Amino acid sequence: MALAIVARTQGDEYQARWFWMNVCRLFEDRTKVFRVTYEQHNIKSFDDIAVSYGAGMTDEDGHPLVADYYQVKFHVTAAGTITWQGMMDPAFINAASVSFLQRLKHAQGQYAPGGIGARFYLYTPWSIDAGDTLASIVSRADGRIMLQRLADGGPRSKMGKARAAWREHLAVETDEELLTILRPLRLRQGPTLQELREALNLRLQLAGLVPVEEGSLIHPYDELTRKLLQAGQTSFTRTEIEHVGKREKLWRGHSVVEHGAYRMGIRSFFRWAEHLEDETDDMLCLLACFNGRKPLSPKLWHTTVFPCVERFLSKMQRGQPYYHLHLHTHASIAVI
């Protein structure tokens, strides 16, 4: 009984801290986020956290992006992994009858028809099983399913068997329908609970919120999240969070030195640049061309990467006196 209570409590803390990590994005200089919601009730699945964007936000492929929805799944131990078959098992998400993939299908049909417009994240400290078919089709760049790899192979291949099983499970007839359902999915491995606490402390300081004292047993943001939920306050803009922070004596403000520079960013690595769009006025995302350190095809350097970078940098010649260039890229891109 005690262990079950600990597991539930730690799961709530994990979700609350990831919520505050996203709340801090509201205070970025060039943020595209205008609202963050805890327990989003208008979406039955992926409702743990919702991040809503203003006009001009795009996904990794340049399509308009309205929101990111998160299902946060904490596990007390590392005694488990994510597999392609497990995603069809309701027990994987502690459900009785509806699987993770079925929830994805429902959410995609409601908020990302055609596979674009929203992204759906599974955020968990568990990793993908290295020996599973899923490991060979999930991008290390951004956690998406690499649809071309999944589509490769005939009915008797590993990919063909996975496609067939998923089609049957989701009650769809064609691979095209299946790939549309999977297109907005992102599988993201989160840190440990302690690592998330440490990362959040840095974000809180940058956002102008009071960090949690190191070694403290009480985490005020965990407790505040519970109290706000009980009061029915679950969705917040920047102004509303600032008001809550001042009321709870967790707001200290911050000053940002702004030199009038136009900030441009290029990203080919996801880690440490997850929200580069919040720090820049204009951003070029090249994640779709890479899987970790390696390009998906050597030809992409000449057909896509170089032309895109060249066009993007040509904007720097259009009359703006100062530029800040943020490069979270492979060294080969940085020297172009």
Regions found by a protein language model. Name each.
Residues 4-87:
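Catalytic centers of nucleases
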